[in-house]
Structures are given as C-alpha cells and as structure tokens.
Amino acid sequence: MKITKLILFIVLFSQGLFASTLHRGLGPEPDSLDIHQAQGLPAIQLLREIREGLTTFDAAGNVVAGTAASWEILDDGKTYRFELRKNARWSNGDALTADDFVRAWQRALAPITLARTAGLLAPVMNAREATEGLVKPSAVGIKALSATSLEIKLNVVTPWFLEVLAHPVAFPLHVEDMAHPLEAPVNGAFMIDNLTFHALIRLKKNPQFHAAESVSLDVVEYFPIEDPNSELSRFRAGELDMTETIPAGRHDWLQTYMGDVLKVSPYIGSFWLGINVGRKPFVDNVKLRRALSLAVDRRIIARLVVGAGELPAWSIVPPGIAGYSPQAFDGSELDQEAREQEAKRLYTEARQGKNKPLLIELRYNTSSQHRKIALAVSSMWRQVLGVDTELVNEEWKVFVNNRRQGVLTQVFRGGWIADYADPTSFLDLFRSDSDLNTTFYKNEVFDRLMDQAIVLKGDERMQHLQRAETLLLKDMPVIPLYFYVSRHLLKPTVTGYEPNVRDIHLSRYLGVKSKTP
C-alpha cells in the first residue's frame, strides 16, 4: 500500500500537480507589456518578473547586479562599463549580448517609439536630443565593446543611475521583440505561460535564467483584480497567497482579526489629484487651483478615508529621501479652519462676476478606495466652496489613455512611486517636455531650475530642487493628499518576503511552504 502511494505521488509530481505555485493579486490590468510603453505599476511589476536589466533589486529592495556580472565607474562618474554574465541567456537559449541592450535603448529613445518613461534615460549622452529628433538614436551614449562588454556615457554625474538600469525602460530586447513582443524570448526568472486578459497571467519558471537554481517557485499566477474588496474576498477564500493592497477603511478591522497576515510598511510614494491646467476653468487660474487644494482636509483623507498609516501630504516629494527636505505649499502651516477661510477668499476672487455654481469633473480609475477618496473630496469642495463635482469612473487602461491625452480630463486621480530615491523622480514629471506630464504644466523657470540642478552636486543641487518644488506648489498643478504606505495580506505559508520602502517583491525570492500530499 505504501509503495502504491509513493508511486502515485511520483506520478502526480512529475505531472506538475504538486508544483510550487504562488497566487498573487496584481491590481488593475497591465496597461502594456512593451517595456517602452508600460507606465503603470502592474505592468512594471510583471515586466520585472519576466525580464531583467543590467541591475535588479534584491528581496530587501537594494540595487544589486542583474544581467551584469560586474561594472566599473570611470571618468569621475560619467562612464559606466559593464561585463555581462557569461551564462546570461534568453529563454529560447540564445546568448544575451551587449547588442541586445544597444538595440533596446536606441528603440526607447527613437522619437517614433514615444516611450513613456524615456525621460529616465535623460542622463545618457545624447538621449534627450535623440527623443527630440535632433540626433539619430545611434548617436546615444551606449555601445557594445564586445559581445559581453557594454559602455554607457553620461552627460552628468547621476548618483541614482544604477537604480534606473533596473527599470523596464532600460531592459534589453531580443531581436524578435521588434515584431512580436508578447511572443519574444525573455531573460527574467519567469516567462509567460498563459495570458487571459482580465482573468489570469500565469508565469512559469525560466530554466535559462542565470540564477534559476535559486528560484524555488515553479509557477506564479497573477490575478488582475481592480476592486480591493474583491481581492480581500478571494484571499479569505484561499484563492490568493498575497494581495496587492487592502480595501480603504479596513485597516483597523484587518489588524484586529487578521493581524498575523497584514503587512504594512513605509513606501516612497505620493498620492495626489492632478489638475489639467491646459483646460478651462484651470487655465491661468492659480487662485482656483489653490482654493480647491486648501478646501481639502488631508488629515481626514489620510486617517479616516484611507486609514492604514498614511501621512497627510503638504508637498509633492515624500519624506525619506536622503539630503532633501520636502517643501510645503502656502497655507499648510495653518489649521484647517484657517485654510478653509483662505480657500473661500481665493475662490471668491477666482470666480468674480460668475454667479453659476462651478461644476468640476473628477476622474479616477476603478477602485473602491479611489471612489471613497473622490466622494470625500467632492463633499469637502461642496461644503467649503459650494463646488459641484461630477465623478467619472474608468477602467485602468481607458483612464491611463485619457489622462495621457488630456482632452477629457479636468481633475484626476494621480500619484507617483519613486523609480529611484531622488527628488527628481517626482519633480521630473512636471517638466514641460516630460511624456508623463499629465497636468500639462509648463513653466520656463521650473524647467530652468531642473536643468541647472543636473550639473550641480550636494547641497547646492538639493537647494535648486527645493526651489523647483516650491514654485511647483505655488502654481498648484496637483493637489497633494497623502504619502503612501505599502499594504499587503500574506499567507503564513509564503516565505522570503521582506518589507522595503520600494515595495518591490520579486517572486524569484519568494517561496511557498510545501504541503504534504
């Protein structure tokens, strides 16, 4: 009898029925799996699972070697030379070469690509000129010295450059990527096994990955779930091992009844409402934008509406970035009653001669938490200023596209998670030439301060960036609401999870405790 059971176990295991599988919530459907078009967190998370750059992140969120085995920094920080791993291969067995990086970067910086995050490569020599069509992409400062050696030249010293190399925009591309990106070979710890939109993205272990022997999971199943309440229900039903987030207002309940599986950690990220300053009624109307900002009680939003340890935001850049003191907008030093009085004064001046109540559209992507925030903000605007608000809810891809085009948007859900630990990760979003500038804010002085900061170092550089943030907050193209914390539910059977301020948890470091069949 024991022999029969043993034989049955061996057969079942060989068929993959006891394969080590992790089930994860993803949040919204990825906006794109093209490394040069993806900009949402779900897409970036998936791309980091199936692809890898010269650098990557370890379980604690630290930058470590990825496809590169080693590197040296020369020319006082302006030249990087990388040696690729000898066992770096694509999932089809092809050798991964330095030319695969050159090909990818030239595509990222070609004007025709319209890469959404190409600005991250701006420190690279001729990168900005290439995106503007002033030079050919082949003139960009990246070249293959040999099949396994790569050289990158920068315009200026960029302390966070190694972090940028771990972003999808800096990943390599197989030659087949140019025609069939979803079917092309990948170089990450996993590869796509099954993709069913709005239902399941199934990843399987990539045996060609350079560190495949250290990856304990055989399969990772990601479930796109926009509604955090639905995600919570599926976690409680045993369908998920790890959630992407928790529902708004449920932190205290979860802490009381599910505290052993609740993981809350600091996070370098800001949540705000963006204002399309290129559309009426916000064009050349700073007083109206400031009035709307001052009328919002951020403490209520952070503590009661969201309620998971978030901090009220008075700035765009969050705390926690070494050497930088976030600036606060005018009026943040007042108590809420005084802020509301100032909001009324500014609103009256902004609406002088107009008797009809103002109607504003507030657009957000599908999420019960985003809806609660939108309802709370619209209630505050109504109570303090008499402003009416029309709430518009959209599926993630539609929302991202409308926000990018700026034809329909007035006020919209916004925010940013740091791509690297520097103020420019947030402030660069508002440069007039940024592809991610969804507020359509344009200020030559702001752009000049950002340009000047590029060639500065130390305290002088940080002071320039602080002046830029101060100017940005005076112009108020966004309404800061709160600073993020990461929030997950994690089954005790999941191993290898380490909280970190980047909230990056690659499945290659995770595992699932084996179950006895």
Predicted regions, residues:
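Long beta-strand-rich cores associated with HINT superfamily self-processing modules
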Residues: H488-P517
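Extracytoplasmic/peripheral linker and loop segments enriched in polar/acidic and small residues
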Residues: I142-K143, R303, Q336, V387-V400, ...
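N-terminal lobe/hinge region of extracytoplasmic solute-binding protein
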Residues: G25-D75, Q106, P185
